[in-house]
Design a protein with these regions (language model features):
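S1/OB-fold single-stranded RNA-binding interface
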Residues: 47-148
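OB-fold/S1-family RNA-binding modules
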Residues: 1-68, 131-256
């Protein structure tokens, strides 16, 4: 039997449904193979664990790693390399942001993006809470970070935002479309909620940031707050965040 801990997480009010989404996709993957799903669950940090049995178990776990990302061991981290992750515990400390890189052999190896480096990269000199608010840096937001320092003895990793993430933030702020970020739901849930609320036509594009993390790019005539009011009650407990360029620019200009 092979067990793989994926980088992708299942969390929030619809954790069970997200796991069923993964189960369905894995079932399709193994349908023509000599492999069976033994179990699908999560660890303490909500990372998805899939156990596979059969002659093709090695092939399946490798395919899962390619599709959803594989968790890491701390000694496999390399400086000056980019790693995908998700922001966690935003607002709990004032000295920086943490990104969960999927390290499974230590609970302390989340990558710290220090406040001073965030200020340099985002060109803003405000406290962390203000920066997080002005750029919508929130829990579960998928980001890519570059590791700048690793201290395995003290279990510390420092990083900076990768250029790909900085470019995404910049492009969103320059865009004249408002966005609603929706985390912890699958695409069919989001599509269904929009259709039931008669707002599917108000969304220009549904951008997938992670497996269960989406950006709803509204049409120019549509306010993201209206979409939030319409689908929020249909997806109770799902984290949603407004990304309104005009308001964010005002916050950034007020604090630089």
């Amino acid at each position: 039997m092979k067990s793989i801990t994926l980088l992708q997480k299942a969390y929030g009010a619809y954790r069970g449904r997200l796991l069923e989404t993964i189960r369905s996709e894995v079932s399709d993957m193994v349908a023509e193979l000599d492999a069976q799903i033994v179990s699908i669950g999560t660890d303490k940090k909500n990372r998805i664990i899939v156990k596979i049995n059969g002659e093709d178990e090695e092939f399946v776990t490798n395919a899962l790693a390619k599709e959803y990302g594989r968790s890491l061991k701390s000694d496999s981290l390399v400086p000056n390399k980019a790693y995908p992750g998700q922001l966690i515990d935003v607002g709990k400390v004032g000295y920086g942001l943490y990104s969960d890189l999927g390290v499974t052999d230590s609970n302390r190896m989340d990558a710290l993006i220090p406040l001073h480096r965030l200020r340099e990269q985002l060109n803003i000199s405000s406290p962390l809470r203000t920066i997080s608010d002005a750029f919508v840096l929130v829990d579960y937001l998928p980001v890519v970070v570059n590791i700048t320092n690793i201290d395995l003895y003290n279990e510390r990793v420092e990083a900076e935002l990768d250029q790909s993430t900085l470019t995404r933030i910049s492009n969103w702020i320059k865009d004249d479309h408002e966005r609603l970020l929706v985390f912890g739901a699958n695409q069919s849930q989001i599509e269904g909620s929009l259709k039931k609320a008669n707002h599917r036509e108000d969304i220009y594009e549904i951008e997938q940031l992670g497996k269960f993390e989406f950006s709803l790019r509204c049409k120019r005539s549509t306010h993201a707050s209206g979409i939030l009011a319409a689908i929020g009650p249909r997806l109770k407990g799902v984290p949603m965040h407004l990304f309104i360029p005009k308001e964010l620019k005002a916050k950034q200009n007020a604090t630089t």
